[in-house]
Regions:
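Metal-dependent phosphoester/phosphodiester hydrolase catalytic core
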Residues: 1-234
Length: 234
């Protein structure tokens, strides 16, 4: 299908605009100029975002905030880690992008997107496929606040504790301490995210369950955050 088929929008009530980006068609064949969502979807966003709605919701698949690996990675013993992770140990604490399949690998296009997002009243970016929970502030290259990113936890995919075990607490603390954009992250539990919107706030609930292998489960923990319109998480 054409690029025009890969954007979806749904207006809910009178203050919520839901916009979904499909990245998968572009990931398969990255061009030299590094387009993640492509011109057609960028133009669609340009032509549709405005201040008519209190909240503009962007749904997409990869971390949008600038995130670097914390120093703890540089101090890890590679003998206890699988081979595919060894390359990341060299850049722990170095402040260079480690996941170039995410928006950190497309900084120019991210800036173009941020320019368009400024047209909205209050932006929430809903991010999946990161395997962990995230709550990030989004800033452009001039340190202008753009919106808040909400990364939903994994259900079946491996999260931080599945890969790093007892190092998980230190990794979470490092991400928060060493990245100004990361206000909170959690990689120990599986679950889902609930979002409750009003004109005055957005209530974000990260809900964790005791098992993802059965239809019968119990909620074991919930982390709740309130996001105010056009306001960074402190």
């Amino acid at each position: 299908g054409s690029d025009s088929d890969i954007s979806e929008a749904t207006n809910i009530e009178d203050y919520f605009d839901d916009n979904s980006i499909n990245k998968s068609k572009y990931k398969r064949d990255l061009s030299v100029d590094r387009k993640l969502i492509g011109l057609e979807q960028m133009l669609w966003i340009k032509n549709n975002l405005n201040k008519k709605f209190k909240w503009s919701i962007i749904g997409q698949q990869v971390l949008m905030a600038q995130v670097y690996l914390p120093t703890i990675f540089a101090n890890m013993n590679k003998k206890i880690l699988p081979d595919y992770l060894h390359k990341y140990l060299k850049i722990g604490g170095v402040n260079v992008p480690f996941n170039t399949d995410a928006w950190d690998g497309y900084p120019k296009e991210r800036e173009r997107l941020f320019k368009e997002l400024k047209k909205a009243d209050s932006v929430l970016v809903l991010t999946g496929d990161t395997h962990n929970s995230w709550l990030n502030n989004l800033y452009d290259e001039n340190n202008n606040f753009i919106g808040v990113e909400i990364g939903t936890p994994a259900i079946s995919s491996p999260n931080t504790i599945d890969t790093f075990g007892s190092l998980t607490d230190g990794i979470e603390e490092g991400f928060i301490k060493e990245n100004k954009n990361v206000k909170w992250t959690e990689g120990k539990h599986k679950g889902y995210t609930l979002l409750k919107l009003t004109k005055d706030k957005s209530e974000v609930s990260f809900v964790y369950v005791n098992t993802v292998k059965s239809k019968v489960y119990e909620v074991i923990d919930t982390n709740k955050f309130n996001v105010k319109p056009n306001t960074p998480i402190i």
